[in-house]
Amino acid sequence: MNRTVLVIAACLAALAYVWGLGGQYIPSNGDEMVYAHIARKTAESGHWLPLASDLFETRNTKPPMLFWQAMVAGDLGGWSLTALRTPGVFYTFAVAAALAWLVARSSGLTGHDAGLGLGQPSITQNAQGSGHRQASAHSPWATGLLAALVFLAFFSTLRYHRAYLTSAPETFWFSLPILVWFWQLGQRTSHHGAIFSIADNTSSSALTPSWPSVVLLGLGLGIGLAYKSFALIAPAAAAWWLVVLASQPWMGWRALMLLSLKVGLAALLALGVFGLWFVLDPDPAGVWQEFIVAENAKKFSDQRGYWAEALSLNGSSIWSQLLAYAVNAGLLAPVVLGLMVMGLQHVFKPQIRFSQRFHAMSPLVALALAWLLVWLVTFTIPSQRSARYVIPAMPAVALLIAVYWPRIHAHWFRLSALLALVGAVLLARVAWVMSELSGGLGISSSLEAVLALALAAGVALAALASLHPRACRTAALLSVLGVYVLMDAVLMPMDSAQAQFAAPDSSTSVPISTPPRVAVPNNFNGQYERYRYILPAGFQPQPYEVGARAAQGKAGLEDLLAQHDSVVWSQDVNTSKPECEPACKVLGVRWVLKSRHLAGEVRLDNLWTPQDWLFAREWWLSRAGA
């Protein structure tokens, strides 16, 4: 792995996560604005608990740590989307740095130290797919950096770690016990011994985490629970327990009992930290009903019946959950599938007994497999299954890909590069349509369009470079990260000052209420909250339903204008003026990206014309006499 290429990839990854962080359209969880609303209302209430919300039966949807984080960040950063999302990015980079450290500290990953530890040299595939034996030329730190970059290249990391409704904190806190355990193993090895060898003192206590670390890590696990849910103590503690067990060549029953006692104590401490919510909240009954019952217990119920849902072929079945890690990888899904195929081939390889495979397995690989197994098995049990639930184990997937990087067949990387190429072409088309060039919509300037097209060309070159046998792997990684940067560049004009509503002057708008009430569209739970980051300061967004449940057309607009000081109204791209004129006047206009498309709205025959389904105009309107 060329170090210069790694540095370029690291710069692309950092740029992808930082650039456009405050954007309205970055990949995120659809419920992000719901949680931003709860955080804002709680901050406005002047107290930390109970949580506050104007949304019906939507208050204690998550433990308070996520909202407290937003309250602190909002106070420091002026309640901007950038401020709310920045802590998640810090957590993400911390996980990536810790992962790089773990892999680099573990071993050089060369020859028999790599992979399954069966004494086989690394295998690199040539362009035709045949393998030739080659000792890995990766330095430990290069392999560690590679693991971090692969983790950042997963789409689940970009989407669910970067947004305010983030998975980054629990990923960090639930990974910490595993990382600290391997640090403790490294501290106990001799100067010349392998990093994972057990110290000469093989007493029960030497084979288990130290008591101080158990207490501190138990408190850390509690912080992770306070971000997401008490139920996650099951996979977090079980993964820690199994990783410690799998990292040792042998553990007697005394050590096993002591390990179970220590992990159990840490779990109790973590649950105690989470339980402080019930102690500190003035409304513990509301916490129980809204969070424990409504948010958690319902995941074990299903109207179709548990087994009917579990064995079905839809997205919530056991079969789909088995592909959760590949789904979370996004554009790198083919590489994850290639890793899985290689693992299955080794498991069923003839003439090697299972016990031999297990005892010869390197502790680093055993760590990752135990980590992945626990999270996957745990989240096949609830009736509501989703690839999102195993996101805290994605660092283990990145670890395995980095370890087996030279051995995964080159064709899997080429498939990822091909997906990145398709994504770059589509994004380039969107950038072209947005631009002033060739009669586009004029949303972006020529300079912004040229920048996006140049980045798309760079991604295309990187993807095509994957055809070279020695460059296919790094080219795939660069092309995937390049797509993320390209996405930021394409979205940049949608978040510029020119794309936002300007405050109307007194000659065009005389507010009737204080603060003036603005009716804004709400096509999903809590989405109207985003207009607090779009409208000028001092205007109060009031949601109205859009879609099948709402009044449509001119009559619906007139009703809204009669009931509010002003209205934000969305119309098709080809509409040059609002349909309420001359009974209304325009306070502002901007372009928006449409989401939650209806069935049949996006088709193969119109995929190349995004102006037909991706864009809309939003008009800020008031009554003509206002």
Regions from the PLM with identified roles:
Residues 2-32, 265-282:
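Transmembrane signal-anchor helices characteristic of membrane glycosylation enzymes that use polyprenol
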Residues 16-20, 34-58, 65, 72, ...:
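Extracytosolic helix-loop segments that constitute the early lumenal/periplasmic catalytic or substrate-binding loops
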Residues 37-41, 159, 184, 219-223, ...:
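Transmembrane-lumen/periplasm boundary regions of multi-pass, lipid-linked membrane glycan transferases
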Residues 64, 68, 77-97, 160-164, ...:
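Loop-to-helix entry region of an early transmembrane alpha helix in multi-pass inner-membrane enzymes
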Residues 86-115, 119-126, 176:
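Transmembrane-helix motifs of polytopic, lipid-linked glycan transferases
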Residues 112-113, 118-138, 177-214, 224, ...:
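Membrane-interface transmembrane helices that cradle and orient dolichyl/undecaprenyl
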Residues 159-170, 386:
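Short acidic/glycine- and proline-prone juxtamembrane loop motifs at membrane-interface regions
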Residues 215, 349-380, 384-544, 556-565, ...:
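Membrane-embedded architecture of ER/inner-membrane glycosylation machinery
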